Amino acid sequence: MAEGIKAGFIGCGNMGGVLAGVAAKALGGDSVYVFDKHPEKTEKLSLNYGCNKAWAAEILEKCGIIVLGVKPQALPDLLEKIKEPLTRRTDRFTVVSMAAGVKTSAIEAALGEVPVIRIMPNTPCASGEGVILCSKGSFAGDEDLNAVLKMFEPAGKLLTVPESKIDAGCAVSGCGPAFVYMFIDALIDGGVRAGLTRAEATLLAEQTVLGSAKYAIQTGAEPAKLKADVCSPKGATIEGVAVLEEYSMRSAVMEAVKAAYERTVELGK
Ligand SMILES: NC(=O)c1ccc[n+]([C@@H]2O[C@H](COP(=O)([O-])OP(=O)(O)OC[C@H]3O[C@@H](n4cnc5c(N)ncnc54)[C@H](OP(=O)(O)O)[C@@H]3O)[C@@H](O)[C@H]2O)c1
């Protein structure tokens, strides 16, 4: 990464805010500039990570990496506003978009021949155990991609994929945290129903999901095999598994991913 690079974030809500924090860990807060319509959001980033509160104009003028963190519906309007200030730049800069479904070609059509990196992050990036999928636009080079990857290194796992796969990835890792939280929440309620306090059930449920994922990663074994390993004949676990099958848990999750994928594609139209 070019020494002394500055990164700017326009739109610092749930996801943009998390990624500004990640960038501050990698680059130092004094190299990160943040702007949002709601000043309280950037105030928090300034207090927590030492990021600089800035105006969009300042970010567009001096940041080498410009991250757009607004909702897909708000992106066309933002692109329209930033086009002119960006044409005045004579140095190299990279535009990063995290907007679900929006193709790099659409951003290039709005901004011209500028280097664009499209990413698909998730909120667990805040804990250092997130996932960010990355794809290069037509005018972005390896140097642009590498600078973005380096800046997001503290987020967790970073995967460069062809852009044709990013919407499917979004349905799994971008939307997946909500599905996993629903599962944890249900596991907690089940524990309370069986007699645990909510605090006890929460600790057990969260640690079980965390440990199961870690163990699957460590062993590299198929989750189906790991499930079979803990189901003893006529045991308690297989009884629970049978109920999940009866209530179509697996097909419900597969349908949820399909619906999220279809909606992601639709958001880009
Ligand atoms: N949340 C996730 O888990 C997740 C995961 C992967 C990708 N993403 C992507 O991340 C992007 C942001 O999602 P989010 O959930 O973080 O949304 P969010 O919480 O609503 O954050 C967006 C922020 O940007 C502000 N904003 C809108 N237009 C602006 C402008 N022109 N200048 C400055 N600030 C502006 C919004 O203000 P207003 O609310 O007043 O409009 C809001 O504070 C989306 O494109 C989404 O597809 C999100």
Description of each model-found segment:
Residues 1-57, 61, 130, 192-194:
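NAD(P)+-binding Rossmann beta1-loop-alpha1 motif at the extreme N-terminus of oxidoreductases
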Residues 2, 206-269:
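NAD(P)-dependent Rossmann-like dehydrogenase/reductase catalytic/cofactor-binding core
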Residues 19, 40, 49, 58-134:
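Rossmann-like NAD(P)(H) cofactor-binding subdomain of soluble oxidoreductases
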Residues 33, 54, 96, 117-119, ...:
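Hydrophobic/aromatic beta-strand patches that form the interior of the parallel beta-sheet core
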Residues 42, 75, 197-204, 226, ...:
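Small-residue helix-packing motif on alpha-helices
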Residues 106, 110-115, 131-169, 180-218, ...:
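Internal alpha-helical scaffold of NAD(P)-dependent oxidoreductase catalytic cores
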Residues 116, 166-171, 223-228:
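Short pre-catalytic strand/loop immediately N-terminal to key active-site residues, enriched for Gly-Thr
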